[in-house]
Amino acid sequence: MNVLILTASTGGGHIRASNALKSYFKEKDNAINVNVVDTFKYINPLLDKTVTNGYLYLAKKTPKLYGKLYKLSNDKPMMNNYVNRMNSIFAKKLIPLIEEFKPQIILTTHPFSTEMIAYLKDKKKINVPLICIMTDYGPHNAWIRDNVNEYIVSNDDMMKEMIKSGVGKDKIHSFGIPIENDFYDDKKNSIYMNDVNLNHHKKVVLMMAGSFGVKNILGIYEDIIDIDYDFELIIVTGRNKKLYEKFQEKVALSERDVKLIYFTEEIVKYMKCADMIITKPGGLTVTEALACNIPLVIFDAIPGQEEENADFLIKNNMAVRLSSNDKSIRNTIEVLLTNDEKLKTMKKACIAFDKSKSCENIFSLIKEIK
């Protein structure tokens, strides 16, 4: 059986979800041939660079504009029509890949990839079942297309919204966003604690700047580092060398035990040690944190999908949001450190949101409809 997974590099989450599925499928059935393809890179490396850099620029430099474009593309048919036309042109470039690989099923973890395959199906260029895996906590019309056979969504609220917008209930599955199974495995927790050299009797705060690094996390560090409470701090700066170097200077002056980490492929190790995570609410980061049953403290949510992710988490008592006020930031973290009952209640909410069978359920689904 050939399974084609189409994704894109706008942020790290789409690729991570795709690779998690590939790992699980191969573990369950070594005879399955799984091909994960970065759609834009395959079509044209220059196109990939343009789309990826454009996304990063909008998200980091002009987040308000990004939020407006996100809303416009969700609400206005004219905006969607422009994107549709562009994707219909690019879609034809995928035909050689599909003809050569001959997939029995296609999975997509990015809205543009979804739209391209849906277009090819509409024009009768291909006839392959399409499963769309939505990698955030709120739906957006860019994902929703007539020729999608099945949708995988992160939560029941998304199902309700999509049904209201006309998607058939039997097409939508609230399996959760697929991630590596290590995030659900608690057997190694004590090993991780020893590996990271942490005190088992102290609370641990994990600060994550995201895969590309976020400068505002430095200000949060300065607000909380001298809180009068004995906790340990892990900082992961992401792929931002300047940010890492600035933290090196700050950490050297601190009396607190701080573990400073550059970009890591072993984020599960640090999440499993944490009592709370200070992070941006990207879809995959959120899912990984919830799988580890760790309450989130959210900052710098990009208007659009990250705001929707944050809203979902806060509504379900799995996260709190930091304001831009220094005193408020300090107070929020201090309350979570000192109020065991509040932290336990949030942790219980994370535990109740159990999506540990996501990869297993998706695997069963492709076996049913291949």
Q: What is each of the regions a protein language model found here?
A:
Residues A20, Y24-I95:
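Conserved N-terminal ligand/cofactor-binding loop architecture of enzyme catalytic domains
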Residues K68-G166, K171:
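Active-site and donor-binding regions of nucleotide-sugar-utilizing enzymes
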Residues N149-V204, M208-S211:
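A nucleotide-sugar donor-handling region in carbohydrate enzymes
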Residues L198-C273:
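Donor-nucleotide binding loops and adjacent catalytic segments primarily
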Residues K272-G282:
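Acidic donor-binding loop of glycosyltransferase active sites
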Residues K315-V320, N325-E341:
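C-terminal "capping" alpha-helix adjacent to the active site of nucleotide-linked donor transferases
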Residues K342-S356:
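A short, well-ordered alpha-helix in the C-terminal region of glycosyltransferases
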Residues S356-K370:
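C-terminal alpha-helical cap of glycosyltransferases
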